[in-house]
Amino acid sequence: MGKGLVTAGWQVRGTTRDPGNAEDILGARLEAVVADPDRAASILDQVGDVTLVFWLLGSALGEPEVIAAIHGPRLEGLMQKLVDTPVRGFVYEAAGRVQRRHLERGAEIVREAAERWRIPVQVVTEDPGDWEAWTEAMLTATERLIGGARRGAAG
């Protein structure tokens, strides 16, 4: 998805919890940053010049309590803090290998934040196992949040 956004003319910052994955992010022509969704401050430190935040953790791996937290209280805390940043939208991945109840709770938190704080959000339920359809759904969510056609598109 990051490559698709870069191709469309956007600057994209990719994050990883594992510094060893930074080279893969750089190889996709993205800015690479180490940040941990279990530590909201590490995410918030990166959003000063960001238009959209993508919470692409539908297939996250880790300890069950950490997975529950990043789709629950950590996500909720992040949404509360995003209100005071320049971020103009949030995309939540509500599909993947994570237990459905966690994804449903995360989607609920994101929708509640949209209602409470008027944060524009998109909840994407496309299966990441279908890479092309998932990528298209993510790009469509991006367009909905920023309005208008994809950057760099003819027309």
Regions found by a protein language model. Name each.
Residues 20-24, 98-103, 131:
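Short, charged/polar "capping" segments at the starts of alpha-helices
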Residues 127-155:
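Glycine-rich phosphate/pyrophosphate-binding loop and the adjoining helix
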